[in-house]
């Protein structure tokens, strides 16, 4: 695991995404995170009027990747593998926060997502009078988050 600098935070705009070893350029990544569900329990003859907090299942949010439309079918193929039953155990995904010099050898943080599957792919919006970049957005479900 790499060590973060303690003197100041890193900027959010230096990052890379790898899906099953293939690097992709994206404008935005959102949804990195994990949560542990907590259940409250109290039995009726408990002498204290407090509930017990018991940890439950781990949950992770879906990851959303946004980028300008590249004319590539890679994201579509990932979703198509899921639709046709060819996804197997899912892919691996790494999201790497890079330092200021964008050195490929030493990302400052790496989030590794396990058993990733594409769940949604959208294109657009398209507007004949618009001046924005045509976008594509992909949403991925995953089972586990590991911080490297």
Predicted regions and their residues:
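Glycine-rich, low-complexity intrinsically disordered segments
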Residues: 1-148
